[in-house]
Regions:
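A short, flexible loop at the N-terminus of ABC-type nucleotide-binding domains that lies
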Residues: 1-21, 27, 69-71
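Conserved ABC transporter NBD signature motif
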Residues: 4, 57-68, 74-75
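Hydrophobic anchor residue at the start of the ABC signature
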Residues: 147
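Helix-to-loop junction immediately C-terminal to a conserved catalytic motif
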Residues: 49
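Catalytic Walker B motif of ABC-type/P-loop ATPase nucleotide-binding domains
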Residues: 158-162, 167
């Protein structure tokens, strides 16, 4: 079943084009939204989450048109949204924060609402921290708390804006496990700078650059864009689209290889860089685009 159908979405801020002719389809599973800073990822997520209207194009979420008041209300009842800034009130406890979100989501019956709050806190592993003040929680716990708030009401569409940013490796792994489980049952759209998130989580990936969709397909297809265009050498080579020194001391290059180059298997990051990036003399960081 098609969860989200976007056709020709556009948005301008004065003379600045934020999005132009953006089209894509979302179904059950996890879709990653990759792109450099300023590509329009957060803007696009906010449009899908009905927090921002588009200037042009059409959007349907489970058949509803969010450009109309009835459609917007219907969509909001079907989605959960984790923005980059969840709007925590530091004096709230974990339970109080999620309970507040549940009230905003129209769960008015107190006993039913508290049962739902307990359910989502348990789902993200925070059942034993429900009475903790938010200011006492670690960064990873706060991210899980924000996810719990997004899951109130068991939404069919979950939108996550860079959910793993700022997490240490262990926290990132736990968060990915939660998202992967969601993707088995829900439609999940997440923005990320981490190609490792895409490799470990996503069935589909969209690459956005300068407000336009540059790619829509599977992670394997994204990596395949760099087939025959990735090689390594002992030293930097001029003329490569992207070139960086790896942890092994070798330089990895993306572009048009010279004769006799030592070609290697392309990664998702290589495919991404083929589309949007120029990297020179940068150290490779596992799972990240540089």
């Amino acid at each position: 079943m098609t969860a989200v159908q976007a056709t020709g979405l556009a948005l301008r801020y004065g003379r600045t084009t934020a999005l132009e002719d953006v089209s894509f389809t979302l179904r059950t599973g996890v879709t990653g939204l990759l792109g450099p800073n300023g590509a329009g990822k957060t803007t696009l997520l906010r449009i899908v989450a009905t927090a921002l209207p588009a200037d042009g194009g059409s959007l349907r979420v489970f058949g509803h048109d969010p450009s109309t008041p009835p459609g917007r209300l219907a969509v909001r009842r079907l989605l959960g949204y984790l923005p980059q800034d969840p709007g925590f009130h530091p004096s709230f406890t974990a339970f109080e924060f999620v309970d507040y979100v549940a009230i905003l989501k129209e769960l008015t019956h107190r006993a039913t609402r508290h049962t739902e709050v307990a359910r989502v806190l348990s789902a993200v592993g925070l059942d034993d921290r429900r009475r903790s003040r938010i200011r006492t929680l670690s960064g990873g716990m706060r991210q899980r708390l924000a996810l719990a708030a997004a899951l109130v009401g068991d939404p069919d569409l979950v939108i996550l804006d860079e959910p793993t940013v700022g997490l240490d490796p262990e926290q990132r792994l736990r968060f990915r496990e939660l998202i992967a489980d969601l993707g088995e049952r829900k439609t999940v759209l997440l923005s990320t700078h981490q190609t490792e998130d895409v490799m470990s989580l996503c069935q589909e990936v969209i690459v956005l650059d300068r407000g336009r969709v540059r790619f829509e397909g599977t992670p394997v297809e994204l990596a395949g864009l760099a087939a025959g265009r990735v090689w390594t050498s002992a030293a930097r080579q001029a003329g490569a689209l992207a070139s960086w020194r790896t942890g092994t001391g070798l330089h990895r290059h993306v572009g048009d290889p010279p004769p006799g180059a030592a070609l290697v298997q392309p990664s998702i990051e290589d495919g991404y860089l083929t589309l949007v990036g120029v990297v020179t003399e940068a150290s490779a960081v596992a799972g990240g685009t540089r």
